[in-house]
Amino acid sequence: MKKTVFSGIQPSGTLTLGNYLGAMKHFVSLQEDYNCYFCIVDQHAITVPQDRLKLRENIRSLAALYLAVGIDPSKATLFIQSEVPAHAQLGWMMQCVSYIGELERMTQFKDKSDGKEAVSASLLTYPPLMAADILLYHTNIVPVGEDQKQHLELTRDLAERFNKKYNDIFTIPEVQIPKVGARIMSLNDPSKKMSKSNPNPKSYISMLDDEKTITKKIKSAVTDSDGIVKFDKENKPAISNLLSIYSLCKGASIEEVEAQFVGKGYGEFKESLAQVVVDTLKPIQERYEQLIQSEELDHILDQGADKANRVARKTLEKAERAMGLGRKRR
């Protein structure tokens, strides 16, 4: 029997090249060997204020991007979190087995609430909902970046706590952090992760950026002064980041890319890198344009929600029975 993989991405604006190389590209190969659930976590997105129309647009755009990169609805389940009510229901039950202290210790909560007068309660209770997302599908593996590892450890703790107190309902998931590409860094500050939330658009490449924009951003990416195209994360973090992008887009090893640019400067390297990135994103963008306003996209999301609802409902009912919720039914 195939193992189950669950992954959720927030619909908070266009995804970056870092999201693609660090996560989505990996998802395409995962769907061949695993039972995959890819969830657009719109309920997580509203932990911070959202414009209603923009959120709807982002949800649809993210769904189209999932499919455009190669997620196949006949092999994987793609759905929207809020269209499966069991997520919020089990999320509440997970809150009931969580402790305030452990939620306050979450690094992301500390970072996002730091210095703010009014903090949404949902920012604190985000991890129990994330635990529910994962546990509903008897997930074995969760592919995440380093920044989500702490939340995953809490998910495991909550599942074990629930199983011990009530019944063995949940599968304890394993964390999987991809070796390469898990962290593509910012183009203008290699100490920070490439992120669409960075106020400087030159720091990231959006998956929907056109050729001219991509070329411009790569040309303006920071480097160092020695002019040698060599991978050295400690002493040459900026060039090492650009080499990682080249290697992942081209499907070549770092050593092969280094060999290609022996005796050549950063200008030539950046020119070639820009073309490699454009060639990687172009077919994705073409498929995205076909999907974004199509009925096909709605049909796929309807099918995904139906399948996810069937599986999630069964798990929820078992958990409710274990806790003594509702009425006993024959």
Curated annotation (Swiss-Prot):
Residue positions of motif 'KMSKS' region: 193-197
Record has Ligase as a keyword: yes
Protein name: Tryptophan--tRNA ligase
Residues annotated as binding L-tryptophan: 133
MF-aspect GO terms: ATP binding; tryptophan-tRNA ligase activity
General function of this protein: Catalyzes the attachment of tryptophan to tRNA(Trp).
Disulfide bond sites: none
Bilayer-spanning residue ranges: none
Enzyme Commission number, as recorded: 6.1.1.2
Main location: cytoplasm
InterPro entries recorded: aa-tRNA-synth_I_CS, aa-tRNA-synth_Ic, Rossmann-like_a/b/a_fold, Trp-tRNA-ligase, Trp-tRNA-ligase_bac-type, Trp-tRNA_synthetase
Catalytic activity: tRNA(Trp) + L-tryptophan + ATP = L-tryptophyl-tRNA(Trp) + AMP + diphosphate + H(+)
Chloroplast is among the record's keywords: no
The entry's keywords: Aminoacyl-tRNA synthetase, ATP-binding, Cytoplasm, Ligase, Nucleotide-binding, Protein biosynthesis
Self-association state and partner proteins as the record states: Homodimer.
Motif 'HIGH' region: positions: 11-19
Similarity field: Belongs to the class-I aminoacyl-tRNA synthetase family.
Binding site for ATP: 10-12, 18-19, 145-147, 184, 193-197
A GO biological-process term: tryptophanyl-tRNA aminoacylation
